[in-house]
């Protein structure tokens, strides 16, 4: 993988990630394909929304179908018939979300298989091996996703263990002679001094890109913005920056304003299945009775298959009848909305008009613009 930074506007960056399997224009949003599928969508449909890269889930694919089944097909690309780049998370977030059925040690995490109750062990080394078999174009290190809230002492211990695990991940990745990219994950909760130690430690080890982890886990938005403003300038300029698990459309806009290149989240697909649809002027809750006789398209500004062919009344009808087609059409639209948003951000950065884009975006959805830190405002001048 190679990253090319093309231009900037303030802290925002316009670039591209170059893989053997294709080019990803950044800033980019990655749809989530937890089990080797973006729920309800064929790979061709996902590609038609403008998606350039997908996220797969190491933990879930390890449990089902398992490494051996994957290798029978070749790798995850062959298994799911997506031939563009794939990023896989390390499994850390899922393991640490298991709560009482897992035990953390220096070596890794012991836990009960949530499917059949078997005792399983996942370590940095094992995570690298699974992701190698998946053929991931971007491999994520195995780390502890520090919960929120966490006091400073706990966050420090967690971050320091994640750094030790980062070294072990790097070593095993290299031993496997994996020619793809390996990203480090910056931890430290909401504490700037701990984030500083994490960034420096990861840069000293050396990675192909750097993710900001441990955000979007319940902390106030102001803390997320503050940490991004503090951390992003410390990441080497020639390496991509990835904000994990984020998020709402406005979170993507704010991440881009602060220098983030990559995002992922289940929100557009999960919300689609619940009838919560993102449009240019905000949100349409399609199961609301007021849409039962609305013959207008979902979003007159959108060029997706759903908006070109169907009315709000039809989508409302499908939702009320629990028809599978409704979830599919909603998902097509929400994913296209996210990709159109990212394309708009990329164009605005290219033209040096990002803040004009931001003003228009917030006016349309009827929300105030979160302030940038003074140093970030200065960077835009």
Curated annotation (Swiss-Prot):
Q: Per its Swiss-Prot or TrEMBL entry, what cofactor is needed?
A: Zn(2+)
The protein's matches in Gene3D superfamilies, at most eight in alphabetical order, are given as:
Queuine tRNA-ribosyltransferase-like
Reaction it catalyzes: 7-aminomethyl-7-carbaguanine + guanosine(34) in tRNA = 7-aminomethyl-7-carbaguanosine(34) in tRNA + guanine
- Annotated substrate binding lies at 89-93, 143, 187, 214
- State the Gene Ontology BP annotations: queuosine biosynthetic process; tRNA wobble guanine modification; tRNA-guanine transglycosylation
Catalytic residues (UniProt) = 89, 264
Would I find NADP among this entry's keywords?
no
Recorded hits in SUPFAM superfamilies, A to Z, give: tRNA-guanine transglycosylase (SSF51713)
Q: If you read the UniProt record, what top EC class would you report for this enzyme, in one word?
A: transferase
Where along this sequence does the record place binding of Zn(2+)? 302, 304, 307, 333
* Single GO term (MF): tRNA-guanosine(34) queuine transglycosylase activity
GO CC terms on record? cytosol
Q: What does this protein do?
A: Catalyzes the base-exchange of a guanine (G) residue with the queuine precursor 7-aminomethyl-7-deazaguanine (PreQ1) at position 34 (anticodon wobble position) in tRNAs with GU(N) anticodons (tRNA-Asp, -Asn, -His and -Tyr). Catalysis occurs through a double-displacement mechanism. The nucleophile active site attacks the C1' of nucleotide 34 to detach the guanine base from the RNA, forming a covalent enzyme-RNA intermediate. The proton acceptor active site deprotonates the incoming PreQ1, allowing a nucleophilic attack on the C1' of the ribose to form the product.
Q: Which family does it belong to?
A: Belongs to the queuine tRNA-ribosyltransferase family.
Identify the NCBIfam families for this entry: Q_tRNA_tgt, tgt_general
Q: How does it assemble?
A: Homodimer. Within each dimer, one monomer is responsible for RNA recognition and catalysis, while the other monomer binds to the replacement base PreQ1.
Q: What is this protein called?
A: Queuine tRNA-ribosyltransferase
Lineage, uppermost ranks: Bacteria, Pseudomonadati, Pseudomonadota, Gammaproteobacteria, Enterobacterales
């Amino acid at each position: 993988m190679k990253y090319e930074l093309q231009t900037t506007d303030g802290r925002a960056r316009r670039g591209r990630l170059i893989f053997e399997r294709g080019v990803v224009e950044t800033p980019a949003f990655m749809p989530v394909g937890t089990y080797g599928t973006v729920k309800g969508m064929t790979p061709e449909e996902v590609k038609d929304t403008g998606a350039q890269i997908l996220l797969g889930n190491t933990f879930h694919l390890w449990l089902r179908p398992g490494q051996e089944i994957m290798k029978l097909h070749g790798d995850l690309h062959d298994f799911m018939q997506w031939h563009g780049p794939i990023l896989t998370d390390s499994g850390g977030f899922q393991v640490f979300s298991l709560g009482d059925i897992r035990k953390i040690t220096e070596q890794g995490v012991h836990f009960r298989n949530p499917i059949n109750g078997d005792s399983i062990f996942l370590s940095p080394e094992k995570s690298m091996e699974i992701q190698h078999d998946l053929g991931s174009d971007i491999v994520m290190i195995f780390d502890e996703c520090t919960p929120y809230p966490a006091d400073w002492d706990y966050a420090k211990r967690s971050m320091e263990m994640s750094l030790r695990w980062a070294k072990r991940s790097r070593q095993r990745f290299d031993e496997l002679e994996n020619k793809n990219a390996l990203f480090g994950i910056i931890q430290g909760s909401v504490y700037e001094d701990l984030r500083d130690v994490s960034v420096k430690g990861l840069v000293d080890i050396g990675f192909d890109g750097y993710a900001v982890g441990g955000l979007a886990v319940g902390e106030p938005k102001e803390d997320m913005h503050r940490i991004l403003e503090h951390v992003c300038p410390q990441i080497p300029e020639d390496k991509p920056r990835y904000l994990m698990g984020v998020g709402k459309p406005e979170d993507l806009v704010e991440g881009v304003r602060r220098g983030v290149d990559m995002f992922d989240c289940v929100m557009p697909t999960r919300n689609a299945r619940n009838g919560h649809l993102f449009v240019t002027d905000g949100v349409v809750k399609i199961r609301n009775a007021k849409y039962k006789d609305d013959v207008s398209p979902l979003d007159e500004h959108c060029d997706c298959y759903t908006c070109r062919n169907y009315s709000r009344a039809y989508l409302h009808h499908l939702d009320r009848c629990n028809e599978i087609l409704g979830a599919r059409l909603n998902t097509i639209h929400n994913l296209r909305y996210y990709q159109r948003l990212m394309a708009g951000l990329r164009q605005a950065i290219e033209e040096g008009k990002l803040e004009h884009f931001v003003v228009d975006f917030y006016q349309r959805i009827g929300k105030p613009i979160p302030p940038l830190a003074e140093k970030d405002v200065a960077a835009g001048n």
